Amino acid sequence: MDLFEYQAKELFAKHNVPTTPGRVTDTAEGARAIATEIGHPVMVKAQVKIGGRGKAGGVKYAATPDDAYEHANNILGLDIKGHVVKKLLVAEASDIAEEYYISFLLDRANRTYLAMCSVEGGMEIEEVAATKPDRLAKVPVDAAKGVDLAFARSIAEQGHLPAEVLDAAAVTISKLWDLFVGEDATLVEVNPLVRTPDDQILALDGKVTLDANADFRHPDHVEFEDRAATDPLELKAKEHDLNYVKLDGQVGIIGNGAGLVMSTLDVVAYAGEKHGGVKPANFLDIGGGASAEVMAAGLDVVLGDSQVKSVFVNVFGGITSCDAVATGIVKALEILGAEANKPLVVRLDGNNVEEGRRILTDANHPLVTLVPTMDEAADKAAELASA
């Protein structure tokens, strides 16, 4: 889960990472009030989960509260690379002597953690890596040893930070590591990390990505979810622990196992070419347990999409046998009742497939069409969606 800058700074404050005071608002009047409260010039910053805010006019310096009001009026509603600005961070402006870069991230290729540090802060790190690779240090981090002050100082040295800031930078770097580990993050980035004229080290901008798989350890992380920007069907699926991604199509997809569901998307897209360009409407993996409750929840989510014209249920029975899946489908249709109002094409294969097919045949539900092969089922689902 990617965080907004203001949320990242809330975690900075929690872990004692020094930054500038500020608050978030969604109105221009709120921006003026915050600037008045701070009592110094401020930065008015668009809160979007995308880079390039400054170039798009989403970050402005305000010398007075009235300036903050004017800038906020101009920034709210601004479209930055497809992201509409709905919130602003109004933070105290800081004098800057130098700008640096520091981040911790997962190095998936080498199965370790990585610290990245550079004296060339305030610019895109990809640009630094491309044009000045010798100025960007990439330091592997042993998770068992962590990042103490001595190692943090070494990271700063390798990033070519000046000698006079090494001790202060080391303290901040070690705290950023504590945040990275303590919050189960996959990325913690500060760009720029600045030195002020009086030699303070401040994190002026922050980016944090949290590992959603660790949410069970962090019930407070639910506060960071941007529910207003999340598709309501995806929210409903998450409540039932279903892996759902909405797509722009007409054939709802329900399957067990990510690989099978991905293959189902492909065969439906291929079949749809013969039926007016019909496409998959979603990715939905119900996992290994296709109980009646899970199947009902999955159907409820898929049928809640007004674009869906038909549903393709594609299940390979393994640990969960096909008869259990078939029973789940029948009971799910009973649970949903009139809400289940679109045709279902069902393909079963694998463990106890004959019994599963018998259960669906005996149920004789008017919405259910049982098809033996994946290709035939995809074609039938596409045909029904195009009707």
From Swiss-Prot:
One Pfam family recorded for the sequence: ATP-grasp_2
Listed GO MF terms: ATP binding; magnesium ion binding; succinate-CoA ligase (ADP-forming) activity; succinate-CoA ligase (GDP-forming) activity
Domain ATP-grasp: 9-236
GO biological process: succinyl-CoA metabolic process; tricarboxylic acid cycle
Binding site for substrate: N256, G318, I319, T320
EC identifiers of the protein: 6.2.1.5
Family: Belongs to the succinate/malate CoA ligase beta subunit family.
Subunit structure, interactors included: Heterotetramer of two alpha and two beta subunits.
Role summary: Succinyl-CoA synthetase functions in the citric acid cycle (TCA), coupling the hydrolysis of succinyl-CoA to the synthesis of either ATP or GTP and thus represents the only step of substrate-level phosphorylation in the TCA. The beta subunit provides nucleotide specificity of the enzyme and binds the substrate succinate, while the binding sites for coenzyme A and phosphate are found in the alpha subunit.
The protein, known as: Succinate--CoA ligase [ADP-forming] subunit beta
Gene field: sucC
